[in-house]
Amino acid sequence: MVLQTMIVRVADSLPLAASMQEDEQSGRDLQKYQSQAKQLCRKLNEQSPARCTLEAGKMCFHYVIEKGVCYLALCEAGFPKKLAFAYLEDLEGEFSEQYGAKVPSVSRPYSFIEFDTYIQKTIKSYIDSRARRNLGNINSELHDVQRIMVANIEEVLQRGEALSALDSKASNLSSLSKKYRSDAKYLNTRSTYAKVAAGAVIIITLIIYVRFWWL
C-alpha cells in the first residue's frame, strides 16, 4: 500500500503538499523514511530522471517529475509498481489542474495542504481490490515501467550523488550496450561474408581442377 506521499517543488525542494497513512497496526516507524524522502527531494534537479524507483529495504520510493513538481510516494516493496506510477500520474493530473499556475509563486511550505483530501481519496481507490483487477487497463495508459530507472536509496544518499548523475551513467551504459550490439552485428556480418568467400574460393578451385583434369 501507499504509506506516504509528498509533493515538492523541484527548484528549491519546497514541500507543497503531503499525506501520511496511519500505520499503527503494523507498528512500523516511518520517521526514517520521512527523513530519506526529504534528503531525496533535496537531490532532485532539472536533470533528474522524470520517473524513478528507489529501493529502501522492505519499502520503495517511486516518483514522477512533471512541470517542475515532484510527486513522491513511499510504498511497500510488494505494492505493484504499475499501480504506484498510475497513482502518481493521477495525482499529477489533478494537482496540476488545481494549482499548477500557483506553484511558481508560493513561498510558504505546504501551501496546498488541503490537497491531502484528494490524496487520501485516491489512495483508497488504488488499494481497493477492483483497482488491482483493473491493472491491465492501467498498463495500456502508462509509460513502460520497465524503462523506469531503479536505484538503491541508501547508495544514492550516502554517495551524495545527484540523481542526474545516475541518469547520466544509465544513459552511458545504454549507449555502450547499443554500441556493443552494433559491433557484434558488424562482426557477425563480416564472419558471414568471410565464410561465403571461402566457400566461393573452394568451389572455383574445384571447377578449375575438374576442367584441367578432363582436358
Curated annotation (Swiss-Prot):
InterPro entries: Longin-like_dom_sf, Longin_dom, Sec22, V_SNARE_CC. GO terms for molecular function: SNAP receptor activity. Residues 1-190 are cytoplasmic. Residues 6-119 form the Longin domain. One of its GO terms (cellular component) is SNARE complex. Its main location: endoplasmic reticulum. It is a single-pass type IV membrane protein. Residues 134-194 form the v-SNARE coiled-coil homology domain. Residues 214-215 are lumenal. GO terms for biological process: endoplasmic reticulum to Golgi vesicle-mediated transport; protein transport; retrograde vesicle-mediated transport, Golgi to endoplasmic reticulum; vesicle fusion with Golgi apparatus. Pfam families: Longin, Synaptobrevin. It is found in: Endoplasmic reticulum membrane; Endoplasmic reticulum-Golgi intermediate compartment membrane; Golgi apparatus, cis-Golgi network membrane; Golgi apparatus, trans-Golgi network membrane. Component of 2 distinct SNARE complexes. PANTHER family: VESICLE-TRAFFICKING PROTEIN SEC22B. This is Vesicle-trafficking protein SEC22b-A. The gene is sec22ba.
